[in-house]
Amino acid sequence: MSEVMDYKSRLSDPASRKFETFSYLPAMNAADIRKQVEYLVSKGWNPAIEHTEPEHLMDSYWYMWKLPMFGETDIDRILGEAEACHKANPNNHVRLVGYDNFAQSQGAAMVIYRGKTV
């Protein structure tokens, strides 16, 4: 069995902090984010945009940007709302969530804009 290594992420080092699954991978560019939105839509999940201040990142509650986009399938419209949220809250973390109606849970959640680190 291979040895498990500690990941070098510390609260004292803002650049090393990890948020969710995708934060352990290289940063996604616009094309990668678009593919994730396409996947979310292809699964029939309802997209929503959430944001929070960096100091409240680990809290359970994030602010919802407008309402969930029930039934929205236009990729550009979803990405446009995420960008609008980021422009209105430039220092906040912004994440995209895909709500699965049938499982009554989140099918996906990822930070797509990182806010100012504290």
Curated annotation (Swiss-Prot):
Pfam families, alphabetized: RuBisCO_small
HAMAP family reported in the protein's UniProt record: RuBisCO_S_bact
Source organism of the structure: Thiobacillus denitrificans (strain ATCC 25259 / T1)
Protein name: Ribulose bisphosphate carboxylase small subunit
Swiss-Prot/TrEMBL GO biological process terms: reductive pentose-phosphate cycle
Complex and partners: Heterohexadecamer of 8 large and 8 small subunits.
UniProt miscellaneous comment: The basic functional RuBisCO is composed of a large chain homodimer in a 'head-to-tail' conformation. In form I RuBisCO this homodimer is arranged in a barrel-like tetramer with the small subunits forming a tetrameric 'cap' on each end of the 'barrel'.
Family: Belongs to the RuBisCO small chain family.
